[in-house]
């Protein structure tokens, strides 16, 4: 590990935190019969509805194939509806999907916040958020190095 820069150590720590957080969230969300990915998809649909499958795929951390399978399952469970408007198929929440999200949302947000609230004060959280936003914006423009 001596050869690693602080940047690579931060990257590894973020990956480990993300994996641990996702595992714990998946376990936590079982009480609502949802996975972390499904929760994210329902939240994005509610926020931006109606939206297309491609628009949704850009907003979540699920592959295009994965999103298609997930939407089929969410539709079977009655959480979403897909409507064909001329050439465009849009996705919206049903009342049942809205109710499922409303049951899970406050508790999931509190659970996720606890990862930070338990160890960082408000000022530290603001600084971390600003730094992560800065890194995220840079990563969106980043290009792969030449071979």
Swiss-Prot record:
The keyword Transcription applies. It comes from the Bacteria. InterPro entries: ArsR-like_HTH, HTH_MarR-typ, WH-like_DNA-bd_sf, WH_DNA-bd_sf. Signal peptide: none annotated. The keyword Magnesium does not apply. Residues 1-137 form the HTH marR-type domain. It holds the Pfam family MarR. Keywords: DNA-binding, Transcription, Transcription regulation. Coiled coil: none annotated. One of its GO terms (molecular function) is DNA-binding transcription factor activity. Residues 53-76 bind DNA. This is Uncharacterized HTH-type transcriptional regulator BALH_1720. It comes from Bacillus thuringiensis (strain Al Hakam).
